[in-house]
Structure formats: C-alpha cells, structure tokens
Design a protein with these regions (language model features):
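Local sequence-structure signature of Cys/Sec-based thiol-disulfide redox active-site neighborhoods
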Residues: 1-25
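Short, glycine/charged-enriched secondary-structure capping and boundary segments
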Residues: 18-20, 44, 68-69
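Conserved beta-strand positions in the Rossmann-like core of class I SAM-dependent methyltransferases
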Residues: 28
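Short acidic active-site motifs
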Residues: 37-41, 71
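Structural micro-motif
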Residues: 45-53
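Non-catalytic, surface beta->alpha helical segment in thiol-disulfide oxidoreductase systems
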Residues: 55-81
Length: 81
C-alpha cells in the first residue's frame, strides 16, 4: 500500500495525490497535522516537508511531488502491480 503523508492546505500534497489518482494508483493519505504519531514518524525519518510518499514503510520516491512527477511511466505501471 502506498501512503502519502500530507498536511492540510498543502498544494504539493494535492498535486501528488492528483497525479497518483490520474495514474490509477491506490493510496492512503495520512495528514501529519491531524496525526501526531505520523508527524513524529515523518520527522524521525529526517523529512521537513510534505508530501512524503512511502510504500510498505519505506520511502518510495525522494523529493515529494517533484520527485514523483519525474518518474517514468514504467514506475507507475509497477505500482499498479
């Protein structure tokens, strides 16, 4: 499962979620401004910005939305399984 760590009022988070939806990728969203454990996880991983996109507890792509949009189509096909 893909997890998008995001915040309210975050335009890059919206763009990342929209791109994943456009590519047909199923994901869950966790808002770190509403979930203190998730916030501590993201900070503990050394991240200071959102979105952060994880798969099975590991960082899927560095750079948030900007890193995600640079991925080739094959990347998204693999995520679909």
């Amino acid at each position: 499962m893909i997890t998008v760590y995001s915040k309210n009022n975050c335009p890059y988070c919206v763009q990342a979620k929209n791109l994943l939806q456009l590519k047909g990728i199923v994901f869950e969203e966790v808002k770190i401004d509403e979930d203190s454990e998730a916030r501590e996880f993201v900070l503990g991983e050394g991240h200071r910005t959102v979105p952060q996109i994880y798969q099975a507890g590991k960082l899927l792509v560095a750079g948030g939305f900007q890193g995600l949009q640079k991925q080739p189509e094959e990347f998204f096909q693999q995520l679909k399984g």
